[in-house]
From Swiss-Prot:
One Pfam family it belongs to: HTH_1
One cellular component term from this protein's GO annotations in UniProt: protein-DNA complex
Purpose of the protein: Transcriptional regulator of the mau genes for malonate utilization.
CDD domains assigned to the protein according to its UniProt record, in alphabetical order: PBP2_MdcR
Gene: mauR
Alphabetical keyword list: DNA-binding, Transcription, Transcription regulation
Name under which the protein is recorded: Malonate utilization transcriptional regulator
Keyword DNA-binding appears in the UniProt entry: yes
Organismal lineage: Bacteria, Pseudomonadati, Pseudomonadota, Gammaproteobacteria, Enterobacterales
Family membership: Belongs to the LysR transcriptional regulatory family.
DNA-binding region, residue range(s): 26-45
One of the record's GO molecular function terms: DNA binding
Amino acid sequence: MKDDINQEITFRKLSVFMMFMAKGNIARTAEAMKLSSVSVHRALHTLEEGVGCPLFVHKGRNLLPLQAAWTLLEYCQDVISLMNRGLEATRKVAGVGQGRLRIGTLYSLTLETVPRIIMGMKLRRPELELDLTMGSNQMLLDMLEDDALDAILIATNEGEFNNTAFDVVPLFEDDIFLAAPATERLDASRLADLRDYADRKFVSLAEGFATYAGFREAFHIAGFEPEIVTRVNDIFSMISLVQAGVGFALLPGRMKKVYEKDVQLLKLAEPYQMRQLISIVYSHHRERDADLLALAAEGRMYARSINR
């Protein structure tokens, strides 16, 4: 399609023009649009040049619209209305601005972090609906990349998302502990050396979970492959198996408050100590999305509250 529209004709200038036609003079237009009178006059003058015919006539200090201006106004209203509908439809297809935010999270974050952030979000944007999806680190990241989620709360590595298409809001760091059945007679005052548990059975999260990666790394440092009885797809099932005496496991410290009476959590000895960095991640191209900006702000407030 051939484009014969002069580059001087912009949506911004059309907006100024429409406001001028409604207000009747430059001063009131400038006040309504929070612009200077000079900016309004320049916008109208360059728009007139772009259209290629007179739109106004000077009468004293006043600028009066000609019939051509009223004709242009009629079409401007149609164009702006059509463009607004087009932008709304575009955002809808992209999942933006529908009054709904699709958030993905690790299962372990539903105990405290996610509820607090959701409560804060409802205070900031009470009309916003929040859809929650739980899964592994890798599953949630794949869904974010496929635009099936708007933001995710996952474990991130330092520098992992540098120079990528994602923005990251760090929330907190969490230690990993050895989890043992409550019936085991262990000295909780001692740091847990994984080599002392080489003859024990373990339960683990499946591949793709953040804690699974730490599990593999810790036992690699310990120098042996643990006997894994079973792998599960959520951390609550893993804790239930530890409670039942099926085996030991490695758990993030954020589970401690809820399960410290049901399982024993021992701090790992120095060679095996590791920390998970929990962050909010979302696409950089959505950085100006008001809902995501609210989520990021709530995340920063949460981070400040627990890192004092």
